[in-house]
Amino acid sequence: MHIHDWPTNERPREKLLARGATALSDAELLAIFVGSGLRGQDAVQTARDLLHRHGPLRPLLDRPAKALERLPGLGPASACKLAAALELAHRHLMSALERGEALSDPPSVGRYFSQRLRARAYEVFAVLFLDNRHRAIAFEELFTGTIDGADIHPREVVRRALLHNAAAVIVGHNHPSGNPEPSEADRAVTKRLLDSLELVDIRLLDHFVIGDGRPVSLAERGWLE
């Protein structure tokens, strides 16, 4: 059955317009770029097959446009649209930092860290420095390591924060394994950072752990109290 034969409220485009993009599954979102699908399949089934054979979503979409266009069901036009959409999303997240806007939306900050760190093959620990109105001052990657971890030095975070005259910081690091669940070591280093920054009256607002899917916020877990 072609998508045009589906009930209107189940078609990906109509569903997105009526209920927003978050209401769609990964396959439904991808189907919007796929278009008509392969012969004998609707676009959603083609998208499901792409995710099954070449997914999950992150490594699939991390491919350059030239690699995407070779996948069954995409082709040059769909690959270019996907690459352009991803780049627009990245620039949108960057724009708030470049304009020095107040960062009051934690999910957006988490997505920004994810854009910067998720594709790394080794662990990277980064810090976003903020002024007293929670406007971005700078973003720095302070520590790098191996696939198993990076050594974090709270004193260096404090030194850089003082250098930027920051009133608050948000930190984040990636898990190359793809599992974003914070480890005991992650919680321990967060406590050390809290204690060190508190000595110089700088707030640690959040610590994001980046892996596959949604970034994990330690503040949301109540682990920064």
UniProtKB/Swiss-Prot annotation:
Keywords in alphabetical order: Hydrolase, Metal-binding, Metalloprotease, Protease, Zinc
Name of this chain's protein: UPF0758 protein XOO0462
Binding-site residues, Zn(2+): 173, 175, 186
Pfam short name (any one): UPF0758_N
GO function terms (MF aspect): metal ion binding; metallopeptidase activity
Gene Ontology biological process: proteolysis
Species whose genome carries this gene: Xanthomonas oryzae pv. oryzae (strain MAFF 311018)
Cystine crosslinks: none
